[in-house]
Amino acid sequence: MSKNIKLTSLTKNSGCAAKIGPGVLHSVLSSLPKFEDENLIVGFDTSDDACVYKINDDTVVIKTVDFFPPMVDDPYTFGQVAAANALSDVYAMGGNPSIAMNLICFPSCLDISIMREILAGGYDKVKEAGAVIAGGHTIADPTPKYGLCVSGFARPEEILSNSNAKIGDVIILTKPLGIGIMNTAAKAELIGENKIKEVTSIMSTLNKYAKECTSGLEIHSCTDVTGFGLIGHGYEMASGSKKTIEIFSEYVPIIDGALDYAKMGIIPEGMYNNLDYLKDKFVVEANISQELQDVLIDPQTSGGLLLSLPEKHAKEFLSRIEKFTPYAKIIGQVLDKGDKPIVIK
């Protein structure tokens, strides 16, 4: 057993870049029969972030599960990022997480103290969210993986979906893109410690604070940007809402250095899976570089919220979130349904 093995050396794909591609996933899920239950408010019909089940007229439960292999070598940080990523789905649905359970796969070649550090990172992030951890499940596995099964609660009218964007809405993204590319560069030892800290800080920031900034505002649609990239999750919102979303590429926040690494070809395998599925679902109308297109489809790990809301409420949201992050920006608008669900300007 070793304390010195790099966690990222034990996995081929890191973080949300390890997700099964959206095309394969869609082909499998679309072939399965659907459960019919009048209390199931949100299932997987529109690829939403979590399921929502009605408990009574005043309460719904939001359920989600998310886990993945490490994208960083520090065990504690890995635990924090994985927990923040799992908790995010509840925030994206308009709820607050209440209870979580650990899911951990752990190899015998690693010292057990590393497992403790991973779990400690998850514990601290769940505590920050105001939720509790009440058990979990472990599996012996050559590839380490960690995440959470999370339950949250909300009132029925508080639920947000990824399928209710309105014509005239603006689109806000709360975290910068390029996380998958930067993690790939870090695994190749191409970036320094300060940049790694910057990227891990972005990943480990809870979307709790962005969600709290929506209080009292008219939010029509919401999702979080994770493994399918901005274009992928934007497509799910546009398709589910039966609208077209226009993205203004020059306003999209991007981590410094991500475009340079993309130009060098330092991109995660998951990006190719995303592109294979999404290539006929968006159109580029601007003269933008290939590396910028790559960043727009880059798989994000614990990415930001993508919000669709009226412009007047967007301005208030941006003024509120300034104290939490410098990255939140208006990056697009919602149009009537056109030839393509996503248009890149």
From Swiss-Prot:
ATP binds at residues 19, 46-48, 66, 89, 136-138. The active site is at residue 16. One of its GO terms (molecular function) is selenide, water dikinase activity. InterPro entries: PurM-like_C_dom, PurM-like_C_sf, PurM-like_N, PurM-like_N_sf, SelD_I, SPS/SelD. The record marks 19 as: Important for catalytic activity. CDD domains: SelD. Binds 1 Mg(2+) ion per monomer. Homodimer. Belongs to the selenophosphate synthase 1 family. Class I subfamily. This is Selenide, water dikinase. The lineage of its organism: Bacteria, Bacillati, Bacillota, Clostridia, Eubacteriales. The gene is selD.
